[in-house]
Amino acid sequence: MQSSQISKTNSAQARSVKLSLAHSPDSDDAFMFYALATKKIKTGNLRFSHTLEDIESLNQKALEGVYDVTAISFHAYAYLADRYMLLPSGGSFGDGYGPLVVARGPLNAQSLKGKRIAVPGKLTTAYLAMRLYEPDFEPVFMSFDRILGRVASGDVDAGVLIHEGQLTYAREGVNKVVDLGEWWNRETQLPLPLGGNGIRRTLDRRIIQQTAKVLSESIRYGLDHREEALEYATEFARGLDPSTADRFVSLYVNDWTLDYGERGRRAVQTLLDRGFERGVLSKQVKVEFVE
């Protein structure tokens, strides 16, 4: 009897797998992870601990392999490909829209050369896209939530806005100079891939595949139960009213998020290929997804 109990305990411990999971405290990520965070879906033997940090902090920690599963910028993936694979769902794409370059004064897209431009981190896709658009500018790195204020005050010539700032910038009296997602679409006829979720390569293959399935189910649950998932996500929307939060989530949680598809995967590879060709990335990277 005692031996049987010990065996059952050991078996249960062997079956239970604890994984550290990190994502940003943004309404689109909150929407994606709603079902997982609130235990609306079954996770089998997987047990997740959730950590919320801004995307550039997550990029930097991914360089150290801190988390088992983490949200990352696709730009950052170029430096993480030896540690992480991309999960097949959870991607954020701007399909004809994306990070916005804004300025306080009468600045146009042709006059960004040499300007001091605030960007939300060296490993963000926003920075990579800005470098592809205009290679010759002076980057001023800062937290994404400070950029709009610094542009409005005139401390920098322009700024690249991500997250909700893309919808609220006009309130601060600044003007749109260029939409980098729109520009990218004209250049490539592809959506601009912004960020996805990476999983550590060193994990057991079955755990990797099971995690991919759980994340996909969490996103599907949110899309199928939009109202309750949106209510949860609005808690992370940094003061946005529900309708604006809804609009933001709609931009970045959609069919692309549930499944990259061939076109989405090609967009990620194209982004990193362009980065290498233009000298922004020091090496060419082959994107690898969990299958």
Describe the function of each predicted region.
Residues 19-20, 83-91, 116:
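A structural signal for short loop-to-beta-strand junctions that line the ligand-binding cleft
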Residues 204-274:
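Secondary-structure end/capping motifs
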